[in-house]
Amino acid sequence: MASPSAAYTAYFSNEKDNTMPVVDTATMKVIKTVEVGQRPRGITISHDGKFVYLCASDDDTIEVIDTATLEIVDTLPSGPDPELFVLSPDGKTLYVANEDDNLVTVIDIASKKVLSEIPVGVEPEGMGVSPDGKTMVNTSETTSMAHFIDTATHEVTDNVLVDTRPRYAEFTPDGKQVWF
């Protein structure tokens, strides 16, 4: 017996024209092109699927887009030039890599407040959080390092030299490994 096909909605950040094209993957057609802030970069979906979070890098903000209406419904603060981010496993916190000031900004989504700014290496980019939410990792492109951060204290616990220009970080589902 054949398994049923799955249809999803895909969201893209289009840096060149400051838009977020939304695609129905069943038809592979653009449903809507949402006008967003300047130089959109990182993008993620809330765990309940109700919101898309998008880095508007040149506006120094995170835009919150309602997935039902495809409208921008809110903005969250960020440091200069937010590039990429990761959502905590409980969906309450965003960890944002801010390229221009070499910081990871910790944002409480509900209160829309910056909880902490954590100094990291030059050109922070990749972001990952462990499945248990206790450890966050940021990669710095220019310094070729991975910075391990305790999410309770917002302190860097370790800096590890990795290969040249790491741009991505992701933990395995069991949390035993992190890939750069």
Locations of the language-model features?
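Predominantly soluble domains enriched in secretory-pathway, periplasmic, or organellar proteins
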Residues: 1-180
